[in-house]
Protein backbone atom coordinates (compact mmCIF):
# COMPACT_ATOMS: atom_id res chain seq x y z
CA UNK A 1 0.00 0.00 0.00
CA UNK A 2 1.53 3.35 -0.98
CA UNK A 3 2.68 5.52 1.89
CA UNK A 4 0.86 8.83 2.10
CA UNK A 5 3.21 11.52 0.79
CA UNK A 6 2.01 14.16 3.22
CA UNK A 7 2.66 11.80 6.12
CA UNK A 8 6.22 11.21 4.92
CA UNK A 9 6.82 14.94 4.62
CA UNK A 10 5.54 15.40 8.15
CA UNK A 11 8.12 12.86 9.34
CA UNK A 12 10.80 14.60 7.32
CA UNK A 13 9.94 17.92 8.91
CA UNK A 14 10.09 16.32 12.36
CA UNK A 15 13.49 14.87 11.56
CA UNK A 16 14.70 18.22 10.26
CA UNK A 17 13.47 19.89 13.46
CA UNK A 18 15.05 17.14 15.63
CA UNK A 19 11.66 16.17 17.09
CA UNK A 20 11.31 12.74 15.45
CA UNK A 21 11.07 9.75 17.80
CA UNK A 22 13.25 6.65 17.39
CA UNK A 23 10.26 4.80 15.92
CA UNK A 24 9.70 7.59 13.39
CA UNK A 25 13.38 7.53 12.43
CA UNK A 26 13.18 3.78 11.85
CA UNK A 27 10.10 4.33 9.71
CA UNK A 28 11.98 6.89 7.62
CA UNK A 29 14.89 4.49 7.09
CA UNK A 30 12.49 1.73 6.02
CA UNK A 31 10.67 4.07 3.64
CA UNK A 32 13.94 5.34 2.17
CA UNK A 33 15.26 1.83 1.49
CA UNK A 34 12.05 0.95 -0.37
CA UNK A 35 12.11 4.15 -2.43
CA UNK A 36 15.82 3.75 -3.21
CA UNK A 37 15.01 0.48 -4.96
CA UNK A 38 12.61 2.18 -7.39
CA UNK A 39 13.41 5.80 -8.00
CA UNK A 40 14.79 9.00 -6.54
CA UNK A 41 13.43 10.40 -3.31
CA UNK A 42 13.09 13.98 -4.52
CA UNK A 43 12.83 15.62 -7.94
CA UNK A 44 16.26 15.17 -9.48
CA UNK A 45 16.42 18.54 -11.16
CA UNK A 46 16.01 20.30 -7.81
CA UNK A 47 18.10 17.98 -5.68
CA UNK A 48 21.10 16.78 -7.65
CA UNK A 49 23.26 16.65 -4.56
CA UNK A 50 20.80 14.53 -2.61
CA UNK A 51 20.40 12.15 -5.54
CA UNK A 52 24.15 11.79 -5.95
CA UNK A 53 24.50 10.89 -2.29
CA UNK A 54 21.56 8.52 -2.57
CA UNK A 55 23.20 6.56 -5.38
CA UNK A 56 26.43 6.23 -3.45
CA UNK A 57 24.72 5.17 -0.28
CA UNK A 58 22.45 2.73 -2.10
CA UNK A 59 25.62 0.90 -3.17
CA UNK A 60 26.66 0.69 0.47
CA UNK A 61 23.40 -0.45 2.04
CA UNK A 62 22.71 -3.16 -0.53
CA UNK A 63 25.98 -4.95 0.19
CA UNK A 64 25.95 -7.67 2.90
CA UNK A 65 26.17 -6.10 6.33
CA UNK A 66 27.68 -8.31 9.04
CA UNK A 67 28.93 -5.67 11.40
CA UNK A 68 26.38 -4.05 13.70
CA UNK A 69 28.32 -0.82 13.64
CA UNK A 70 28.37 -0.83 9.84
CA UNK A 71 24.59 -1.25 9.86
CA UNK A 72 24.32 1.74 12.15
CA UNK A 73 26.52 3.83 9.88
CA UNK A 74 24.37 2.96 6.87
CA UNK A 75 21.15 3.83 8.70
CA UNK A 76 22.65 7.02 10.13
CA UNK A 77 23.83 8.04 6.68
CA UNK A 78 20.34 7.48 5.27
CA UNK A 79 18.91 9.79 7.90
CA UNK A 80 21.69 12.24 7.16
CA UNK A 81 20.78 12.30 3.47
CA UNK A 82 17.08 12.55 4.30
CA UNK A 83 17.81 15.47 6.60
CA UNK A 84 19.86 17.34 4.04
CA UNK A 85 17.43 16.51 1.24
CA UNK A 86 14.38 17.72 3.10
CA UNK A 87 16.29 20.81 4.12
CA UNK A 88 16.86 21.50 0.44
CA UNK A 89 13.25 20.61 -0.34
CA UNK A 90 11.65 22.77 2.30
CA UNK A 91 13.75 25.89 1.94
CA UNK A 92 12.96 28.51 -0.74
CA UNK A 93 14.66 27.99 -4.09
CA UNK A 94 17.66 30.24 -4.56
CA UNK A 95 20.42 30.66 -7.09
CA UNK A 96 23.87 29.23 -6.52
CA UNK A 97 26.04 31.46 -4.35
CA UNK A 98 28.82 32.63 -6.67
CA UNK A 99 31.13 32.82 -3.64
CA UNK A 100 30.61 29.15 -2.78
CA UNK A 101 33.66 26.89 -3.09
CA UNK A 102 33.52 24.30 -5.84
CA UNK A 103 34.98 20.78 -5.53
CA UNK A 104 38.17 19.55 -7.14
CA UNK A 105 38.53 18.25 -10.69
CA UNK A 106 41.00 16.72 -13.15
CA UNK A 107 44.05 18.96 -12.72
CA UNK A 108 47.75 18.13 -12.85
CA UNK A 109 51.16 19.30 -14.01
CA UNK A 110 53.57 17.04 -15.89
CA UNK A 111 57.23 17.91 -15.28
CA UNK A 112 59.52 16.27 -17.83
CA UNK A 113 63.03 15.05 -17.05
CA UNK A 114 64.52 18.20 -18.62
CA UNK A 115 62.41 20.48 -16.42
CA UNK A 116 59.76 21.33 -19.02
CA UNK A 117 56.34 21.80 -17.43
CA UNK A 118 53.11 20.85 -19.20
CA UNK A 119 49.75 21.79 -17.68
CA UNK A 120 47.49 18.79 -18.16
CA UNK A 121 44.56 21.05 -17.31
CA UNK A 122 45.24 23.29 -20.32
CA UNK A 123 46.92 20.92 -22.79
CA UNK A 124 44.86 19.65 -25.71
CA UNK A 125 43.98 15.98 -25.90
CA UNK A 126 46.36 13.77 -27.86
CA UNK A 127 50.13 13.32 -27.89
CA UNK A 128 51.82 15.85 -25.59
CA UNK A 129 55.39 14.52 -25.37
CA UNK A 130 57.77 11.98 -26.91
CA UNK A 131 60.87 10.94 -24.98
CA UNK A 132 63.37 8.29 -26.01
CA UNK A 133 61.30 5.09 -26.10
CA UNK A 134 57.95 6.40 -24.78
CA UNK A 135 55.05 8.49 -25.98
CA UNK A 136 52.83 10.40 -23.55
CA UNK A 137 49.21 11.05 -24.45
CA UNK A 138 46.43 12.95 -22.71
CA UNK A 139 42.90 11.56 -22.99
CA UNK A 140 39.68 13.50 -22.57
CA UNK A 141 38.66 11.82 -19.32
CA UNK A 142 41.52 12.78 -17.03
CA UNK A 143 44.07 10.15 -18.04
CA UNK A 144 47.76 10.42 -18.87
CA UNK A 145 48.77 7.41 -20.95
CA UNK A 146 52.36 6.18 -21.30
CA UNK A 147 53.06 3.84 -24.24
CA UNK A 148 56.25 2.36 -25.65
CA UNK A 149 57.12 3.73 -29.07
CA UNK A 150 56.40 1.06 -31.73
CA UNK A 151 60.04 0.94 -32.88
CA UNK A 152 61.39 0.80 -29.33
CA UNK A 153 59.50 -2.20 -27.90
CA UNK A 154 61.82 -4.14 -25.63
CA UNK A 155 64.62 -1.56 -25.62
CA UNK A 156 65.96 -0.01 -22.45
CA UNK A 157 67.84 3.14 -23.38
CA UNK A 158 65.89 5.89 -21.60
CA UNK A 159 66.87 7.12 -18.15
CA UNK A 160 65.61 9.66 -15.65
CA UNK A 161 62.18 10.46 -14.23
CA UNK A 162 59.14 12.50 -15.13
CA UNK A 163 56.93 13.85 -12.33
CA UNK A 164 53.16 14.26 -12.24
CA UNK A 165 51.93 16.75 -9.63
CA UNK A 166 48.33 17.38 -8.61
CA UNK A 167 47.51 20.65 -6.80
CA UNK A 168 45.06 21.04 -3.98
CA UNK A 169 41.71 20.50 -5.66
CA UNK A 170 43.14 18.24 -8.35
CA UNK A 171 43.29 14.54 -9.22
CA UNK A 172 44.55 12.53 -12.19
CA UNK A 173 44.91 9.01 -13.55
CA UNK A 174 48.03 7.52 -15.14
CA UNK A 175 48.23 4.43 -17.36
CA UNK A 176 51.71 2.89 -17.61
CA UNK A 177 53.18 0.95 -20.57
CA UNK A 178 52.76 -2.35 -18.70
CA UNK A 179 49.01 -1.71 -18.31
CA UNK A 180 49.20 -0.70 -14.64
CA UNK A 181 46.84 2.10 -13.61
CA UNK A 182 47.45 4.75 -10.96
CA UNK A 183 44.91 7.22 -9.54
CA UNK A 184 46.61 10.24 -7.98
CA UNK A 185 44.71 12.11 -5.26
CA UNK A 186 44.82 15.85 -4.53
CA UNK A 187 48.07 17.56 -3.49
CA UNK A 188 50.22 14.58 -4.47
CA UNK A 189 53.17 13.85 -6.75
CA UNK A 190 54.36 10.75 -8.57
CA UNK A 191 57.84 10.24 -10.09
CA UNK A 192 57.82 7.82 -13.02
CA UNK A 193 60.88 6.37 -14.78
CA UNK A 194 61.20 6.98 -18.49
CA UNK A 195 62.25 3.39 -18.99
CA UNK A 196 59.35 0.95 -18.61
CA UNK A 197 60.68 -1.48 -21.22
CA UNK A 198 60.82 -5.21 -20.64
CA UNK A 199 63.54 -5.97 -18.14
CA UNK A 200 63.50 -2.48 -16.63
CA UNK A 201 62.71 -2.00 -12.95
CA UNK A 202 59.12 -0.99 -12.22
CA UNK A 203 59.67 1.60 -9.51
CA UNK A 204 57.76 4.82 -8.77
CA UNK A 205 58.08 7.41 -6.01
CA UNK A 206 54.99 8.81 -4.28
CA UNK A 207 54.30 11.84 -2.12
CA UNK A 208 50.67 12.13 -1.04
CA UNK A 209 48.06 9.51 -1.91
CA UNK A 210 47.50 7.15 -4.82
CA UNK A 211 45.56 4.01 -5.66
CA UNK A 212 47.34 1.36 -7.73
CA UNK A 213 46.11 -1.43 -9.97
CA UNK A 214 49.34 -3.18 -10.92
CA UNK A 215 49.51 -5.58 -13.85
CA UNK A 216 50.81 -9.02 -12.93
CA UNK A 217 54.36 -9.71 -14.10
CA UNK A 218 56.02 -12.47 -12.01
CA UNK A 219 59.57 -11.54 -13.05
CA UNK A 220 59.16 -7.77 -12.58
CA UNK A 221 58.19 -6.60 -9.09
CA UNK A 222 56.49 -3.20 -8.84
CA UNK A 223 57.79 -0.94 -6.07
CA UNK A 224 56.22 2.22 -4.62
CA UNK A 225 58.63 4.31 -2.53
CA UNK A 226 57.57 7.05 -0.10
CA UNK A 227 60.60 8.29 1.81
CA UNK A 228 61.94 5.32 3.81
CA UNK A 229 58.70 3.41 3.22
CA UNK A 230 58.44 0.94 0.33
CA UNK A 231 55.67 -1.32 -0.97
CA UNK A 232 56.64 -4.17 -3.30
CA UNK A 233 54.16 -6.21 -5.34
CA UNK A 234 53.96 -8.46 -8.38
CA UNK A 235 50.38 -7.61 -9.36
CA UNK A 236 47.65 -6.33 -7.08
CA UNK A 237 45.27 -3.51 -6.07
CA UNK A 238 46.25 -1.28 -3.16
CA UNK A 239 46.20 2.28 -1.82
CA UNK A 240 49.10 4.23 -0.33
CA UNK A 241 48.53 7.37 1.74
CA UNK A 242 51.80 9.18 2.49
CA UNK A 243 51.16 12.89 3.03
CA UNK A 244 53.94 14.88 4.68
CA UNK A 245 51.49 16.65 7.03
CA UNK A 246 50.11 13.40 8.45
CA UNK A 247 51.75 11.43 11.29
CA UNK A 248 51.75 8.07 9.51
CA UNK A 249 51.90 6.27 6.16
CA UNK A 250 49.04 3.87 5.44
CA UNK A 251 48.99 1.05 2.89
CA UNK A 252 45.62 -0.64 2.31
CA UNK A 253 45.36 -3.87 0.32
CA UNK A 254 42.29 -4.78 -1.72
CA UNK A 255 43.56 -7.69 -3.83
CA UNK A 256 46.67 -9.84 -4.05
CA UNK A 257 49.61 -9.54 -1.67
CA UNK A 258 52.09 -6.76 -0.88
CA UNK A 259 55.21 -6.47 1.21
CA UNK A 260 55.72 -3.25 3.16
CA UNK A 261 59.20 -2.33 4.41
CA UNK A 262 60.61 0.56 6.41
CA UNK A 263 64.19 0.34 7.62
CA UNK A 264 64.64 -3.06 9.25
CA UNK A 265 60.88 -3.59 9.65
CA UNK A 266 58.83 -5.59 7.15
CA UNK A 267 55.28 -6.98 6.98
CA UNK A 268 53.23 -8.82 4.37
CA UNK A 269 49.60 -7.77 3.94
CA UNK A 270 46.61 -9.89 2.98
CA UNK A 271 43.46 -8.44 1.35
CA UNK A 272 41.44 -6.37 3.82
CA UNK A 273 44.48 -5.36 5.86
CA UNK A 274 46.15 -1.99 6.34
CA UNK A 275 49.68 -1.30 7.51
CA UNK A 276 50.48 1.87 9.41
CA UNK A 277 54.01 3.23 9.66
CA UNK A 278 54.44 5.68 12.54
CA UNK A 279 57.59 6.63 14.43
CA UNK A 280 59.56 3.87 12.74
CA UNK A 281 57.17 1.06 13.66
CA UNK A 282 54.76 -0.83 11.39
CA UNK A 283 51.42 -2.12 12.69
CA UNK A 284 48.76 -4.09 10.81
CA UNK A 285 44.97 -3.98 11.26
CA UNK A 286 41.86 -5.32 9.54
CA UNK A 287 39.90 -2.53 7.83
CA UNK A 288 36.94 -1.83 5.59
CA UNK A 289 38.86 -1.14 2.38
CA UNK A 290 35.92 0.82 0.95
CA UNK A 291 36.84 3.65 3.29
CA UNK A 292 40.46 3.68 2.13
CA UNK A 293 39.57 4.00 -1.56
CA UNK A 294 36.36 6.02 -1.31
CA UNK A 295 38.18 9.07 -2.70
CA UNK A 296 39.05 7.17 -5.87
CA UNK A 297 35.37 6.24 -6.34
CA UNK A 298 34.32 9.89 -5.99
CA UNK A 299 33.04 10.16 -2.44
CA UNK A 300 33.99 10.81 1.16
CA UNK A 301 33.38 7.98 3.62
CA UNK A 302 34.00 8.72 7.30
CA UNK A 303 33.44 6.15 10.02
CA UNK A 304 33.97 7.63 13.48
CA UNK A 305 36.91 9.71 12.23
CA UNK A 306 38.49 12.67 14.00
CA UNK A 307 37.40 16.03 12.65
CA UNK A 308 41.02 17.15 12.23
CA UNK A 309 41.72 14.16 9.96
CA UNK A 310 38.50 14.72 8.00
CA UNK A 311 39.27 18.39 7.44
CA UNK A 312 42.75 17.59 6.11
CA UNK A 313 41.08 15.64 3.30
CA UNK A 314 38.49 18.38 2.77
CA UNK A 315 41.17 21.09 2.67
CA UNK A 316 43.18 19.25 0.01
CA UNK A 317 40.16 18.57 -2.19
CA UNK A 318 38.59 22.04 -1.99
CA UNK A 319 41.90 23.94 -1.73
CA UNK A 320 41.00 25.75 1.48
CA UNK A 321 42.59 26.55 4.82
CA UNK A 322 41.00 25.28 8.05
CA UNK A 323 41.06 27.10 11.39
CA UNK A 324 39.79 25.52 14.63
CA UNK A 325 38.57 27.89 17.35
CA UNK A 326 39.97 25.48 19.92
CA UNK A 327 41.98 22.26 19.80
CA UNK A 328 39.27 20.21 21.54
CA UNK A 329 37.15 20.43 18.38
CA UNK A 330 39.81 18.47 16.48
CA UNK A 331 38.86 15.39 18.51
CA UNK A 332 35.17 15.48 17.53
CA UNK A 333 34.26 12.37 15.50
CA UNK A 334 31.96 11.97 12.51
CA UNK A 335 30.45 9.20 10.41
CA UNK A 336 29.01 9.94 6.97
CA UNK A 337 29.00 9.00 3.29
CA UNK A 338 28.73 11.76 0.70
CA UNK A 339 29.87 12.64 -2.81
CA UNK A 340 33.10 14.60 -3.30
CA UNK A 341 31.56 16.41 -6.25
CA UNK A 342 29.43 18.95 -4.45
CA UNK A 343 30.00 22.52 -3.37
CA UNK A 344 31.58 22.90 0.02
CA UNK A 345 28.51 24.57 1.55
CA UNK A 346 26.54 21.35 1.06
CA UNK A 347 29.27 19.22 2.63
CA UNK A 348 29.53 21.53 5.65
CA UNK A 349 25.74 21.52 6.06
CA UNK A 350 25.85 17.73 6.18
CA UNK A 351 28.52 17.78 8.86
CA UNK A 352 26.74 20.42 10.93
CA UNK A 353 23.64 18.21 11.05
CA UNK A 354 25.60 15.25 12.43
CA UNK A 355 27.80 16.89 15.04
CA UNK A 356 28.18 19.63 17.62
CA UNK A 357 30.23 21.98 15.47
CA UNK A 358 29.43 24.82 13.12
CA UNK A 359 31.33 26.21 10.15
CA UNK A 360 31.91 29.73 8.88
CA UNK A 361 33.43 30.30 5.45
CA UNK A 362 35.44 33.45 4.81
CA UNK A 363 36.94 33.44 1.33
CA UNK A 364 39.06 30.30 1.16
CA UNK A 365 39.22 29.80 4.93
CA UNK A 366 36.88 27.61 6.98
CA UNK A 367 36.47 28.52 10.65
CA UNK A 368 35.22 25.75 12.94
CA UNK A 369 33.59 26.47 16.30
CA UNK A 370 31.29 24.78 18.79
CA UNK A 371 27.62 24.77 17.87
CA UNK A 372 25.69 27.37 19.83
CA UNK A 373 22.56 26.21 21.68
CA UNK A 374 19.32 27.18 19.95
Q: What residue spans do the PLM features occupy?
A:
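Membrane-interface anchoring determinants
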Residues: 2-11, 25-29, 33-103
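Regular secondary-structure segments
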Residues: 12-16
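Charged, low-complexity interaction regions
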Residues: 19-20
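Amphipathic alpha-helical interaction segments
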Residues: 23, 39-41, 80, 154, ...
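A residue-level detector for the "anchor" residue at the start of short, highly conserved motifs
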Residues: 67-74, 85-374
Amino acid sequence: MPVDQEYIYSLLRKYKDRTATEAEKEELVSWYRQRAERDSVFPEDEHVVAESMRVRLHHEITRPQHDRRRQWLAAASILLIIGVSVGLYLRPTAGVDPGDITPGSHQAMLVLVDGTKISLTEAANGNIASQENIQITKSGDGQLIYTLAPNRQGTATASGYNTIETPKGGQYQVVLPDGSKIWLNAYSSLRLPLNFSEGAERRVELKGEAYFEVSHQPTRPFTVVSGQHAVQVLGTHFNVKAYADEPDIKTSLLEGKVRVTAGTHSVTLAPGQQSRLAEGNITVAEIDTREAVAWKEGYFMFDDERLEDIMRSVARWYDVEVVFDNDALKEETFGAVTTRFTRISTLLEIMEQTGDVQFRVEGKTIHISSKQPV
